[in-house]
A protein has these predicted regions:
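Alpha/beta-hydrolase active-site loop
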Residues: 79-99
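Alpha/beta-hydrolase-fold enzymes
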Residues: 118-144
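Active-site glycine-rich loops that stabilize anionic/oxyanionic intermediates
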Residues: 34-38
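Conserved alpha/beta-hydrolase
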Residues: 47-74
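N-terminal cap/lid segment of alpha/beta-hydrolase-fold proteins
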Residues: 1-22
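Alpha/beta-hydrolase fold nucleophile elbow
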Residues: 102-113
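Alpha/beta-hydrolase fold active-site loops
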Residues: 27-31, 106
Length: 144
């Protein structure tokens, strides 16, 4: 577990990191970006499966979700108008933090539902430098 200040300068983001027991032969990293009303804890079994195969798995509870839910804030509330950009930047901060820790590992990202829109925005943003080796968009739509 790792916490960092959100790009909104208010929320504290909760980054969950799952690592294989045997760290001698790591195959890659998988970042999960969850959907609306979810949190990283819902992906524990998925993370356990991939760590058993040699992958480091990570993801944040986005603003208004899971451990990133602030006292008194509403569940699934992303913030005031314009907050979408903060959410995208926070997911990118997770990417940046994990690349610092494991710079040589291949990097894959999975976005589910709303998380797929976040991932698409992050990858298409010209000001966020993101280099990944694979992307899985699950339950996405045609327009974010």
């Amino acid at each position: 577990m790792f916490n960092f200040k959100s790009s909104d300068k208010d929320a504290v983001m909760h980054l969950e990191i799952y690592t294989p027991e045997d760290k001698s032969n790591l195959k890659g990293m998988i970042q999960i970006c969850h959907g609306m009303t979810e949190y990283m804890g819902r992906y524990d079994k998925v993370a356990q499966y991939f760590t058993s195969k040699g992958y480091v798995v990570c993801g944040i509870d986005i603003i208004g979700h899971g451990h990133s839910l602030q006292n008194g804030s509403r569940k699934a509330y992303l913030g005031k108008k314009g907050s979408w950009e903060y959410v995208v930047k926070d997911v990118h901060t997770c990417y940046t933090e994990m690349k610092k820790r494991y710079p040589k590992l291949p990097y894959y990202i999975v976005g589910f539902s709303m998380g797929s829109f976040i991932v698409r925005d992050m990858l298409l943003s010209p000001h966020l430098r993101t280099k990944i080796d694979g992307c899985f968009l699950i339950g996405t739509g045609s327009q974010p």
